């Protein structure tokens, strides 16, 4: 399974990338806006840190706007993946872009039919949202399972990026269900390395070693 970082904070990306577990990065307009910096500059900086797919999202609403913006974004770096919203206009754009060899990540997927449509249109990645589905009482895990089953059954080349990840339990569950990728907020990465028993165990080891060295 691959781990992507869901952030545009360059310093956080640089620090977490040193762990050797980061395979890519995802961003969206909300994440970019929180940084208060130029969109293109941020994406290019991220591409220099992480050697993997870097998702950058369009902001246009029509297919024509998305296509024009995507063509421009795709030129920023070979690792850039253009993020497209799951709408009818987004599907039109994805179809055109896929034929041009531009990698796409179709986002805001909440149903199997949406995921299937995105894959049919040629999406490189599809991003179902875990936390947001839980917020409305829906079962995000069934969605992941169903989408993975469809990919395996029909041979679609798209990969599932489990998004809207909020807890380590989310990561563990989607890993078991066959999501190819989990995109994880930077604060959660730190929490996933920690456990009180690990901390206490290390403390005991060090205390015992200090006593022995005396």
From Swiss-Prot:
Give the top-rank taxon of the lineage listed in the UniProt record for this protein.
Bacteria
Q: List localization entries.
A: Cytoplasm
**Alphabetical list of SUPFAM superfamilies matching this protein:** Aldolase (SSF51569)
Q: What is its EC number?
A: 2.2.1.2
Which pathway does the UniProt entry assign to this protein?
Answer: Carbohydrate degradation; pentose phosphate pathway; D-glyceraldehyde 3-phosphate and beta-D-fructose 6-phosphate from D-ribose 5-phosphate and D-xylulose 5-phosphate (non-oxidative stage): step 2/3
Q: Does the keyword Transmembrane helix apply?
A: no
Q: What is its main location?
A: cytoplasm
Q: Name one Pfam family in it.
A: TAL_FSA
- Which UniProt keywords are given for this protein, alphabetically ordered? Cytoplasm, Pentose shunt, Schiff base, Transferase
Carries keyword Manganese? no
InterPro entries with a match to the protein in the record = Aldolase_TIM (IPR013785), TAL/FSA (IPR001585), Transaldolase_3B (IPR022999), Transaldolase_3B/F6P_aldolase (IPR004731), Transaldolase_AS (IPR018225), TSA/FSA_arc/bac (IPR033919)
What are the protein's GO molecular function terms? aldehyde-lyase activity; transaldolase activity
Q: Which reaction does it catalyse?
A: D-sedoheptulose 7-phosphate + D-glyceraldehyde 3-phosphate = D-erythrose 4-phosphate + beta-D-fructose 6-phosphate
GO BP, one example? carbohydrate metabolic process
Residue numbers annotated as active site: 83
Q: Relate the protein's function as given in its record.
A: Transaldolase is important for the balance of metabolites in the pentose-phosphate pathway.
Record family assignment: Belongs to the transaldolase family. Type 3B subfamily.
Q: What protein am I looking at?
A: Probable transaldolase
In which organism is this protein found?
Streptococcus equi subsp. zooepidemicus (strain MGCS10565)
Which gene carries the instructions for this protein? tal
